[in-house]
Amino acid sequence: MEKEAIYKLIRESPPGEVNQVVHDIRDIGLSDEEAIHEQLKLYHEDYNSSVSISDDEKVIISADNRLEGNRYYDQVLQKSFTINYETMEAENVEDYTEAIKIPDEIVKQIKKVASDHYLSDVTFGIIKKSDEVESFTIVLVSSKYNPKNYWNGSWRCICNYNVSEKKLEGRSHIRVHYYEDGNVWLDASRPISATVEETSKLYEVLAQVENGIQQSFNVELSSLNDKKFKELRRQLPVTRQKINWENVSGIRMRNT
């Protein structure tokens, strides 16, 4: 029962708020530290959290780039590292040359997508598991945390590019939590499916697909605000009486 509660509470944590959730879990007496550590690891892997391994280098963590002994690696930077899941700090950073080298042409195009189309803090990773198949897992993550204004959010693009099949397939995910005078959650995703005739067109295709997904989210959010949220607002009563606005400043609520 305790492990299930820990799983659900951590799993449903909004972007940028999981540490506060863990703090609250301990405050209410859930003290299975092994379960907390395991769920923290899975949370950061599943939502592709990023960590800094140097002053100017950030990497993504996932189940796909995990090594034995609780280590992870970045195929582009050719580095491996461990992680403190509570502080989200990379530790024991080492060179790692055993992974397959990612072609420069692909790295340059994904870097360009990140720099041209992501306004907030963005990190990317590219993973290739086999020399036999020209297939690359591409992960782009952009997060923006603004707790002073009561909102946090993240955008993730996870797709697979198969060179021989000329296919780009995956999903883009958006998760936003707004909690000023309420508690509004947005957790949605859209499929990615496109043809990439040649590797040199990867930037163009991925940028076009992501722009289309963003526009579809914008349309849906506009509709949500104009229709669904309006239905939730309390309708003021119609009294059909005129108000003497000059005397409004002198009105006081009667004690009840």
UniProtKB/Swiss-Prot annotation:
Q: How does it assemble?
A: Component of the F-actin capping complex, composed of a heterodimer of an alpha and a beta subunit.
The protein's job, in short, is: F-actin-capping proteins bind in a Ca(2+)-independent manner to the fast growing ends of actin filaments (barbed end) thereby blocking the exchange of subunits at these ends. Unlike other capping proteins (such as gelsolin and severin), these proteins do not sever actin filaments. Competes with formin cdc12 for attachment to the actin filaments barbed ends. Slowly replaces cdc12 on the barbed ends in preparation for filament disassembly during contractile ring constriction.
Give the UniProt keywords, A-Z: Actin capping, Actin-binding, Cytoplasm, Cytoskeleton, Phosphoprotein
Location in the cell: Cytoplasm; Cytoplasm, Cytoskeleton, Actin patch; Cytoplasm, Cytoskeleton
Which cysteines share a disulfide bond? none
- Organism equals Schizosaccharomyces pombe (strain 972 / ATCC 24843) (Fission yeast)
Protein name (database record): F-actin-capping protein subunit alpha
Q: Which PANTHER family match?
A: F-ACTIN-CAPPING PROTEIN SUBUNIT ALPHA
Might you name a Gene Ontology BP term for this protein?
Answer: actin cytoskeleton organization
Q: Keyword Metal-binding on this protein?
A: no
Residue positions where Phosphoserine is found in the record: 31
**Which InterPro entries does its entry note?**
CapZ_alpha (IPR002189), CapZ_alpha/beta (IPR037282), CapZ_alpha/beta_2 (IPR042276), CapZ_alpha_1 (IPR042489), F-actin_cap_asu_CS (IPR017865)
GO MF, any single term: actin filament binding
The record's Gene Ontology cellular component field reads:
actin cortical patch; cell division site; cell tip; cortical cytoskeleton; F-actin capping protein complex
One Pfam match, given by its short name, reads: F-actin_cap_A
UniProt family annotation:
Belongs to the F-actin-capping protein alpha subunit family.
